[in-house]
């Protein structure tokens, strides 16, 4: 699947779209703001002319001639008017304008440069407001400015925005009110749709390679994995896996992603998936991990993890089905071929190593083979004791000791034997 073909990241969720339609229908009486000296005559005159331009051609002509005035008016209105309904209206107009033509972000960059500001500096403070619609429209505009503009968001602004995204995704329960201010509550359904809006902002940001590195540095992968492990709805699931797919377009990111249990988590979701779009994005993510990795060892590690998680069997089952989307069939064919090649080169120790790294060991015959351990025990020390460190991280010693009281006699026996050998080894070291 090509990155250019994935266009739904900027599409608003149902609740955002419905509220935006409601906001557009409630026209603002700009004349009353002018009479109350809350806005200037210049801004009042321009916003009224802007509203009168119905066709895209008329609007484009106005923006080409008076782009600077447009940015100035929108920002003045947004910062000087406190009424929430009017702020919502202004943000919706800005979002619509940018969505119609992505290049229009330049009018905000040009205006900001004159005041030695950044284009998003006017919108970032709005992330702290109470109204959910206002907050998320501002978040969408920030993402569009950052993703579609010629200048990159950097430093404290980018850290602030990414931390806000992480907080929203991690909580999945956004505070504030939207429309139903009388009750002071937001339904679970509404809340989940706002989280999807946040995920959409992340999807848009991660299309830009530089932002992928910044997201990873902000510990963003842990945030994504946390959401996926939290049994979220299929739409948010899709968006988080979409984000992994975007990250995996970068070879360096493929290297970094080895630290996380991505393959087992996606494998579990694939097995339970009933939505074709979720299946499609998982297969595309798997393909990127194998195809974009430049290091042979990295590709091999991902392939082994997929084999260990029984992805081959799932692919064979999926291959029997018919799909409208050609990308799915192509990705299945690619993965079957690559994993088939890896199976040929797979040694028993490779399989054991892959199982251990995934935290999913299976009691297969090879694990009980004395010959296997005589030949391979020393290999646990390879790569600066990499596998021994994994065992330590998994709490291997404590797990073995827990099994000394296991109901199965064979398990108890092996656990006692292992603990005995550990103690003997420690005594010998002390001597």
Segments (PLM) and residue ranges:
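Extended amphipathic alpha-helical scaffolding regions
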Residues: 74-78, 94, 123-124, 158-166, ...
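Short sequence/structural elements of tandem HEAT/ARM alpha-solenoid repeats
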Residues: 64-72, 106-118, 154-163, 213-219, ...
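Alpha-helical solenoid repeats of the armadillo/HEAT superfamily
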Residues: 35-48, 82-99, 128-147, 158, ...
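N-terminal "cap/leader" segments of large eukaryotic alpha-helical scaffolds
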Residues: 1-86, 99, 333-387
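Eukaryotic helix-linker segments that join adjacent hydrophobic helices
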Residues: 57-144
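Conserved blade-ending motifs and adjacent loop-strand segments that build the rim/top face
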Residues: 312-323, 404-406
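Buried hydrophobic core positions in alpha-solenoid tandem helical repeats
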Residues: 73-76, 108, 119-125, 161-169, ...
